[in-house]
Regions:
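Membrane-cytosol interface segments of multi-pass membrane proteins
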Residues: 1-177, 289, 310-348
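Interfacial loop-to-helix transition and helix-capping segments at the boundaries
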Residues: 45-58, 129-142, 182-211, 245-268, ...
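Short juxtamembrane and helix-loop transition motifs at transmembrane-helix boundaries
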Residues: 81-82, 98-107, 124-132, 188-195, ...
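Alpha-helical transmembrane segments in multipass membrane proteins, preferentially the mid-helix core
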Residues: 146-155, 211-225, 267-280
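Hydrophobic alpha-helical segments of polytopic membrane proteins
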Residues: 156-171, 221-243
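Alpha-helical transmembrane segments of multi-pass integral membrane proteins
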Residues: 210, 237-345
Length: 348
């Protein structure tokens, strides 16, 4: 799977994330916030699509991270070169710090109750230990841990044969389920140690998708599937049909995030086949800005403007407005980073 395809999939995932955070809140069902169509059990389609399908975005991001770092390992680490994980994570933190520098002062003005002037709290949010400033950052610290340890994790995975792969799959699946269950038990934001423990449990929960992404690299799953589908004259139709079937199948199941485990790799695989050899500039644009949009969009939904975006009433209109303002903000942030990142990298 090439960079263009990965970028397009990231573009799809960030759009899913924005829809998720707009419509997964059951408090909006009273009809005063936005117009909606009922689906079943008295809940709107926008909610079911968000909660059941769009909530797959984070596991899918982590899958792509495992896949991408697996590719980097095979290209660089095996020849003794650095994977650049330290620089990669540092640049992500710089991006976060720029966003905090922009949005926290704005938040202190518009929503001072939510943004107290605590230096400890500021440091915790700058490192990802706390996500009090923006709950959408919850998987920042788990990602940093996975990325920084990826060289050793991937080296461990690559040394096994088929039997070892089966054992590792079952072991990491059990660890992921344990992490998912444990998050609810330790999710206490009042103590820094509990916040660290929550981040660790989130990392354990996400580790299986990270592992599966690496396994796709180890066994060339996507490349083999693309080559196999190339023998069919209607490969695009088949892969599109697979995506539609997977979406419908997921909508017919429960809300548990554990259900994403089998669906996420299949969705990514189907999208990789569907988008292979294509260059959709629209999706690539959102893929390029996906990190910034992840880090900023929730400010516009709740933390600063306190749900004012729902004044637009209609789900598609609200969604397009959030996408537009998040994208515009991302472009501004990229302009700032053009000056900030080189200066900081020179000092290191």
């Amino acid at each position: 799977m090439g960079k263009d395809t990965t970028l397009q999939i990231k573009g799809i995932l960030i759009l899913m994330m924005l829809w998720l955070h707009l419509y997964s809140n059951e408090d909006l069902f009273d009809g005063t916030c936005y117009e909606f169509l009922y689906w079943f059990n008295g809940k709107p389609f926008s909610y079911h699509f968000a909660k059941k399908f769009c909530s797959m975005c984070v596991p899918a991001y982590i899958f792509l991270s495992g896949y991408g770092l697996g590719k980097v390992y095979c290209k660089k680490a095996l020849s003794g070169q650095s994977m650049g994980n330290g620089k990669r994570c540092f640049n992500l933190y710089v991006r976060l710090w720029v966003i905090i520098a922009i949005f926290v002062p704005i938040g202190c003005y518009f929503n001072p109750e939510h943004y107290p002037y605590s230096m400890l709290e500021l440091v915790e949010n700058m490192t990802g230990i706390s996500t009090y400033y923006n709950g959408a950052w919850w998987f920042l610290l788990p990602y940093i841990i996975l990325a920084m340890s990826s060289r050793y994790f991937i080296r461990y995975i690559m040394q096994f044969g088929k039997k070892g792969d089966i054992v590792n799959t079952l072991m990491l699946l059990a660890i992921s389920v344990f992490g998912y269950v444990a998050i609810a038990k330790v999710n206490d934001s009042t103590d820094i140690l509990m916040r660290l423990l929550t981040g660790l449990m989130a990392m354990l929960y996400l580790s299986f998708m990270f592992f599966v992404g690496i396994m796709f690299v180890k066994h060339n799953v996507i490349e083999k599937a693309i080559n196999r589908m190339a023998t069919f004259s209607n490969a695009t139709r088949y892969s599109l049909a697979a995506v539609v079937v997977l979406i419908i199948g997921r909508l017919c199941m429960g809300n548990s995030a554990l259900i994403h485990i089998p669906f996420t790799p299949l969705i990514i695989l189907s999208l990789a086949i569907l988008l292979n050899g294509k260059s959709n500039k629209f999706l690539q644009l959102f893929g390029h800005h996906s990190t910034n949009m992840w880090l900023v969009h929730f400010f516009f939904i709740t933390y600063i403007f306190d749900g004012q975006i729902y004044i637009l009433r209609y789900p598609i209109v609200i969604f397009v407005a959030l996408v537009a303002i998040s994208l515009a903000t991302s472009k501004i942030i990229d302009r700032i980073l053009m000056y900030v990142q080189p200066l900081l990298n020179k000092r290191l």
